[in-house]
Amino acid sequence: MNSALARRVEELQKFKSDFFGRVRELIKGRKEIRIVGDRFVFQSEVLFKVGSEELGIKGQEEMAKLAITLMDIEKSLPTDIDWILQIDGHTDNLPVKKGQDYLDNWELSTKRALSVLRFLIKQGIKPDRLSASGYGSFQPIDKKNTSIARAKNRRIEMKITQSTKTNQ
């Protein structure tokens, strides 16, 4: 049993490595999309208009490329490898303006992550391979109170990880 589990973990690692390698080629030389540790970081300005949860044209193009890469690599994976693409939305620390469609940054970050998730499903990614979370302004990557720091903190992060579903 342990050898089977070790094999699945090894295959998931290979999948992650292949995926990262292919996406790295897609984003080569682009500052607004980067790899940080085991995550892809897309700046919100690439994907969304300011204060909006809807993917813009450029955001749709980027997510379509990502979906094609993910589906292509998934074809070579054994079917018993349980993985998910975790999509995390983050905002800056400025409050949502009055009159906007969001109560707060928690809601905006969550709706942005869900917007990416739903777009990927429309592109053919299986829903059970996706998960979305919103963190509002509470996990900044730059804690300075400057416009540059706020721009860095407005982002979507994606990570391939092992699924937590259990076989019951």
Segments the model singles out, each with a brief description of its role:
Residues 1-34:
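Extracellular/lumenal/periplasmic "stalk" regions immediately C-terminal to a signal peptide or transmembrane helix
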Residues 20, 24, 35-43, 168:
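C-terminal targeting/interaction modules of large eukaryotic coiled-coil scaffolds and adaptor proteins
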